[in-house]
Regions:
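Hydrophobic residues within alpha-helices
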Residues: 31-35, 121, 168, 209
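Beta-strand segments within the central parallel beta-sheet cores of soluble alpha/beta enzyme folds
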Residues: 23, 216-226, 277-281
Length: 304
């Protein structure tokens, strides 16, 4: 079923490429918004919580789907940004959505997922039969990057089909790096998350030491932020960590999910990532204490 919200002009009625963006969470909401600003595209959105879709269509130029099961529209591309493997499987593989995508179209998944899911989608009979190009395209840059359209995209998929998806990805990114074939985007995101987790652990321990030593932490930041210790985490989280402000950003529970994916992959490769295992235990402690929705920088609370 399709519920059309009247666009601000009648341009949606023209014959233009049609794209569906599924998943209007913290990241997906503004990403779909940036995509809708392209006057040469028809953008449709879907979210399991319908009131979020209602909010989106009131703010941006587009229409919403009430259901994926009985959609009569034929899409040129589908973009997903969802929570986990189960959510993505439900939307892409088990909703009937593949009946609503054109032959030779594309699917771009911005979620962080397992390699097994990438393989399952890429090799699904309907994907192969309709010659659909699937790209695993996890992102980095957080909520701020999504809002400002400045995400970094790690892309895995068929290089020959890149031109198809660039019109979408360029709407909300500052960089698009094609890493390699299917799965390489997710592998790169695993590397990214392991690095970030270690940075946050180190930053937490450094701030804890400085604070317990009664240092002027603003002066400490001034002294070290221009040197080798500088990082995005330091620039954007140092001051909020000092204040104990964690009610924003990338949630602890999502980092737990991402670290589990990375550590599962490392196990398959006979790698013992002891530091990452220890950090995962710390994040699990936070989650069990009720802090699973706080920003990952809340790791410092365990050192209080």
């Amino acid at each position: 079923m399709l519920l059309m919200y009247p666009p601000r002009n009648r341009s949606l009625q023209k014959s233009k490429p049609k794209y569906l963006f599924a998943g209007l969470g913290t990241m997906g909401f503004p990403m779909a918004g940036h995509l809708s600003k392209n006057p040469n595209l028809d953008v449709y959105v879907f979210n399991r919580t319908s009131k979020i879709s209602d909010k989106w269509v009131k703010k941006y130029h587009g229409a919403k789907l009430l259901s994926l099961n009985s959609c009569s529209i034929k899409f040129d591309g589908i973009i997903t940004c969802l929570k986990d493997d189960a959510s993505i499987s439900s939307v892409i593989l088990n909703s009937g959505l593949l009946k609503s995508i054109k032959t030779n179209a594309f699917i771009v998944d911005h979620s962080t997922t397992s390699l097994d899911l990438v393989s399952t989608i890429s090799n699904h009979p309907d994907i192969l039969d309709k010659k659909i190009s699937f790209f695993d395209a996890p992102v980095s840059g957080g909520e701020v990057g999504a809002i400002n359209g400045l995400l970094s995209i790690m892309l895995g998929g068929p290089k020959a089909k890149l031109s198809k998806v660039k019109i979408v990805l360029e709407a909300y990114s500052k960089s698009i790096t094609h890493i390699g074939p299917s799965g390489h985007g997710q592998l790169t995101k695993m590397v990214n998350q392991l690095c970030i987790a270690s940075l946050i652990q180190g930053l937490s321990e450094g701030i804890a030491l400085g604070s317990k030593s009664n240092l002027n932490m603003n002066k400490v930041l001034e002294a070290i932020s221009g040197g080798a210790a500088q990082s995005w985490q330091m620039d954007n989280r140092f001051k909020t960590m000092i204040k104990g402000d964690f009610d924003f950003g990338f949630a602890v529970d999502l980092m737990i999910k991402d670290l589990k994916i990375a550590l599962n992959q490392s196990k398959k490769l006979d790698l013992n990532l002891s530091t990452s295992k220890s950090i995962l235990k710390n994040y699990n402690k936070l989650s069990l204490s009720g802090d699973g929705n706080l920003d990952t920088s809340s790791l410092i609370k365990l050192l209080g």
